Structure formats: C-alpha cells, structure tokens
Amino acid sequence: MPASIGGLPLPRICPHFLTLRVAIRAHLTDHVHIGLSGGPDSLALVAAARAEGAEVTAICINHNLQEGSAEVSERAAAQAEHMGATALIRSITVPPGSMEAQAREARYAEFAQLTDTIWAGHTMDDQAETFLLAGLRGNPAGMKSASRRPDLTVIRPLLGVRRADTHGACTELGLTPWQDPQNRDRAFRRVAIREQVLPLLAEIHAGDPVPGLALAATRAAMEGEALEFFVDKRRGEWADGFPVRLAAEPHALRRLMLADFLRGHGVRVTSKKIEAVDRLLTHWHGQGGVAVGGGAHGRLEVVRVSGKLEITG
C-alpha cells in the first residue's frame, strides 16, 4: 500500500479501507471519473481509486437544492484534490417533479457532458433500500454493477460493500465527509425505509436483512438484463409494426418488447400503457385503439391492423 495519496497519509492498518480497495479492483482502469457528493461513500471511493493507482477525476455536482450547496461542492472538490485527484464542479438546475428522480436524471445528464463512464458510490445497503422502494412501486428491481444508458455507463464498484465500510474507511483515513441533512429526514421514503423498515425487518428476521435483500435485488437485475438481451437481439421484428404473433411470447419478455416498440415512437412508457396495449394482442375482440400520449403531430394511438400493432398520430 502506498504511504500516501496526494497529501493524505495512509495508515498501515485500515481494514475497512482495504475492503473498498479489493472491491474496486475488478472495475479499475487507468483513469476513472467518479461522481463525488462529498458524502462518505463517494469520498471513500475516490480515496480507494487513488490508493489503487488510478488517475481520478472527481465530478462534484451542485444541484442547488439546499442552502450552502455550493460550499459543499467546493469542500468535496478540495478533499479530492488533497488526495491527488482532479476535481471539477458543475452547477445544475433540477426541473420540478420527484426531487430524487429529477436530481438523478439532471446529474447523469451533466456527467454525460464530461465522460462516457462514471463511477458511483452505491453500496449493498443502497441496493437493499432500492429493492424495497422499487417493490412498493410494483417493480422490484435492483441496481446493476454496470448500467448502460444511451449516453453514459454507470459503474457501481461498491455494490458488494457495506455502508459501514465506507464510513469506517473515512474514519481510518481521517476524512470528514459531508453529512447530508436530508439523509435524516423521514419524509423521504428511502430514509424511512433505512431508519424504520430495515430495523423492524432485522427484528423479525432475527438478523441483518440487508444481504438477503441485496441478493434478491442483484438477481432481479440479472434477470432483467437477460430479458433486455433478448429484446436487443429481436428489435428488428417490430421495426415495421409489432407483429400479433408475438402474443405467444412469455408475458415478461412481451412487456419489454412492447415497451421498446413504444419508446421507438417517442412514447413515454408506463405500466398502465403497456398493459392496455398488450390487451390488443392477448384479449382482442375488435376493440378500438389505445391512446398512448401526444406526439409531434398530435395524439398518438396504438391500433391493430392486418396482423400487427401500429402507432398513428
């Protein structure tokens, strides 16, 4: 282990930090870009990547959602630079709507302006919380270690690492991370799950529920990835309308195919729309078309014509 990273000396014995270093090795490249909030997870991730010899560019996003957010970004950037990383600060405007979702999309859009691959500090605990949140929305799913968006790949090297290790690593290295006050506000569902639901599950389960939930999330993510693979392979089948014969496909695969078909025509996909369109395949009795939103030329509608589904509007 190096004696220091930049101007930060490294202690000889630091088991939490070693856990992080081992975890990231499978994802390591010569130069990595890391989304740095200044919190324990991303700060420890920057330190681990630097200790493993990577050149690091830390991208600090000021979402302008909290008082003092500019100072938080500046402090995080200074900490990264002290560890020998390059730091960039970007200020963004988050559109109205679901704050967590809109902030994430705005942040990823900004990352995509700077790199094609970004590391995120999500841990096993985040994975378990995400699985429960997604389940409440009727779509139990997990984060993948590598998520590919149209313009950005998100790498999550710490999904197998506990939050206690990132916090412990910061303590071992003498780093003082930013503690987001919103992480204590139970008005946010994720915080309520973290502070109320998971402790109750631990009591009922008579043990830590996080590893099992995280494993379920990982399996859901892998199964989803397999289905997406088949959709990618078969996309040409619905390039000129969605064939009615695909009604024979398994429901889960057919839903993804329909979602891909709709997105290809600029439709904002929801479960309700997919189910309504699916009935044109599986419960056909001559009914009219299904409205799926507005397009550039007006109302969009899916209709069944001559053995296939078409979008008009």
UniProtKB/Swiss-Prot annotation:
Its EC number is 6.3.4.19. InterPro entries: Rossmann-like_a/b/a_fold, TilS/TtcA_N, tRNA_Ile_lys_synt, tRNA_Ile_lys_synt_N, tRNA_Ile_lys_synt_subst-bd. It is found in: Cytoplasm. One of its GO terms (molecular function) is tRNA(Ile)-lysidine synthase activity. It catalyses: cytidine(34) in tRNA(Ile2) + L-lysine + ATP = lysidine(34) in tRNA(Ile2) + AMP + diphosphate + H(+). Pfam families: ATP_bind_3 (PF01171), TilS (PF09179). Signal peptide: none annotated. CDD domains: TilS_N. GO terms for biological process: tRNA modification. Its main location: cytoplasm. GO terms for cellular component: cytoplasm. It comes from the Bacteria. ATP binds at residues 37-42. Belongs to the tRNA(Ile)-lysidine synthase family. Ligates lysine onto the cytidine present at position 34 of the AUA codon-specific tRNA(Ile) that contains the anticodon CAU, in an ATP-dependent manner. Cytidine is converted to lysidine, thus changing the amino acid specificity of the tRNA from methionine to isoleucine. HAMAP family: tRNA_Ile_lys_synt (MF_01161). The N-terminal region contains the highly conserved SGGXDS motif, predicted to be a P-loop motif involved in ATP binding. This is tRNA(Ile)-lysidine synthase. It comes from Corynebacterium efficiens (strain DSM 44549 / YS-314 / AJ 12310 / JCM 11189 / NBRC 100395). The gene is tilS.
